[in-house]
Amino acid sequence: MRLTPELLVECYRRGLFPMAGPGGRVGLYRSDPRAVLELDALHVSKSLARVLRKGVYEVRIDQDFEAVIRACADREETWISEEIIRAFLGLHRRGLAHSVEAYDGEGRLAGGLYGVALGGAFFGESMFSRRPDASKVCLVRLVERLRERGYVLLDCQVQSPHLERMGAVEIPEAEFMRRLSEALRLDRAFA
C-alpha cells in the first residue's frame, strides 16, 4: 500500500488513521474505544491559564507545517515515517492538513501540533513540545479555533495521560463513527 493524500482522506472518512511500525511500514488502524476531546470540556489548569494570560508563546497557524510534523517525528520511537510525512505534506498543500505552532520570544518553534480537517471534524495526529506548556498552549488555541468555526468533533485517536488531563474522554467506536458521520456532513473552514 502506498500512502497518498487521497488515501488518507478516505481513511479518515472511515475512521482509520495511519501509523508506521518498525522499519517504517505503514498500517491503518482503528481504536476502540476512541479518544475525543469534547470542545466544551477542555480542562485548562491554573498554571496553563497563567501561561496563556502572560502570552509566553506566539501562536501561529500553518506557518511551518513541515517543521511541526518533522519535530513530532523526531523521537526515539516514532510512528511517523517519511512516507507519512510526504502524504501529510500533500494534504497540507491541498488545505486539509493544518498545524498550530507556538513560538518563543526569540521566534523559535517551541511546540506544535498537526492534524486533518474534514467537514466539521478535526483529527489530531501528533504534538511536540521543546519548552514547557508549548504543546498545551497549541491545543487550547486549536480548541478555541474549532469552536469559533463550528466544528463538532476533535478526534484524539488513542487516549494518553496528557490528553486525559486536558479533558479527553474515551467513547465506543460505534458512537465515534456515528458522530464522525454527522461531522462529515458539515461544511467548515479551518483556515
Swiss-Prot record:
It is found in: Cytoplasm. Its EC number is 2.3.2.6. GO terms for cellular component: cytoplasm. It catalyses: N-terminal L-lysyl-[protein] + L-leucyl-tRNA(Leu) = N-terminal L-leucyl-L-lysyl-[protein] + tRNA(Leu) + H(+); N-terminal L-arginyl-[protein] + L-leucyl-tRNA(Leu) = N-terminal L-leucyl-L-arginyl-[protein] + tRNA(Leu) + H(+); L-phenylalanyl-tRNA(Phe) + an N-terminal L-alpha-aminoacyl-[protein] = an N-terminal L-phenylalanyl-L-alpha-aminoacyl-[protein] + tRNA(Phe). Keywords: Acyltransferase, Cytoplasm, Transferase. The keyword Phosphoprotein does not apply. Pfam families: Leu_Phe_trans (PF03588). This is Leucyl/phenylalanyl-tRNA--protein transferase. It comes from Rubrobacter xylanophilus (strain DSM 9941 / JCM 11954 / NBRC 16129 / PRD-1). The lineage of its organism: Bacteria, Bacillati, Actinomycetota, Rubrobacteria, Rubrobacterales.
